[in-house]
């Protein structure tokens, strides 16, 4: 893998014109809410804000924390609060999509139009509480176990290996990124995760878009 990365770097043509710089993504100054009328049985709700670049050192803490918040399926807080306890949706998830620049953080759900406001209130409350308090040590350990245990599945084919090599090269990551990934996750503490979420998410300044029939 290191040889592949070295070859990619050696074949860079210095005479090739570089792409223009992209302006950094500006943080949101205030919350924005948009309701778009659309005749459908389900309302689509999206909550989000600018997130992080892939090179951000908080990427590992946010990855582990997001598993607890909304990336871990039925064990996540969003799924437990919005679906399991209240039956407001079949599914809800949160994602960070880091890129060269700050990619989005987003929470997505579908619900009946007459339940959209309640589902939104519950989801934003969960986000706010998680940013304020972070995960419990038990939640974080479960997330770490899942992420570390599933890591080999990200490398179990040539296509996946090549995709990881391309990701390292594209984002300018350290060449030993795959070798150290599980260690970076394993050493995280609940305080690390809480601090990272507080640095990067502003629950009271997110954009919310609801598309569907108005109740």
Where are these regions (language model features)?
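M16/insulysin-pitrilysin zinc metalloprotease superfamily fold
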Residues: 72, 97-154, 176
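Non-catalytic beta-strand/loop surface segments
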Residues: 6-56, 70-117, 139, 183-205, ...
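Divalent metal-coordination and catalytic microenvironments
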Residues: 47, 63, 82, 123, ...
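C-terminal regions of mature proteins
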Residues: 109, 141-215
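PAPS/PAP-binding and catalytic site of the sulfotransferase fold
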Residues: 1-5, 123-124
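Conserved NTP-handling cores and scaffolds of large molecular machines
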Residues: 8-12, 72, 86, 127-134, ...
């Amino acid at each position: 893998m290191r040889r592949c990365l070295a070859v990619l770097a050696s074949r860079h043509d210095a005479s090739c014109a570089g792409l223009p710089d992209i302006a950094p993504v500006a943080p949101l100054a205030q919350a924005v809410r948009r309701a778009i009328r659309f005749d459908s049985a389900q309302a689509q709700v999206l909550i989000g804000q600018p997130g992080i670049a892939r090179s951000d050192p908080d990427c590992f803490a946010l990855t582990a924390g997001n598993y607890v918040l909304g990336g871990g399926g039925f064990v996540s807080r969003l799924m437990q609060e919005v679906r399991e306890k209240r039956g407001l949706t079949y599914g809800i998830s949160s994602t960070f999509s880091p890129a060269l620049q700050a990619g989005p953080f987003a929470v997505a759900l579908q619900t009946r139009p007459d339940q959209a406001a309640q589902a939104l209130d519950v989801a934003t409350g969960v986000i706010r509480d998680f940013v304020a308090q972070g995960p419990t040590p038990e939640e974080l350990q479960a997330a770490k176990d899942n992420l570390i245990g599933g890591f080999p599945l990200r490398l179990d084919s040539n296509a996946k290996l090549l995709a990881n090599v391309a990701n390292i090269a594209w984002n300018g990551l350290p060449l030993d990124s795959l070798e150290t990934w599980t260690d970076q996750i394993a050493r995280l503490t609940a305080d690390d995760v809480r601090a990272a979420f507080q640095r990067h998410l502003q629950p009271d300044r997110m954009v919310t878009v609801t598309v569907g029939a108005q109740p």
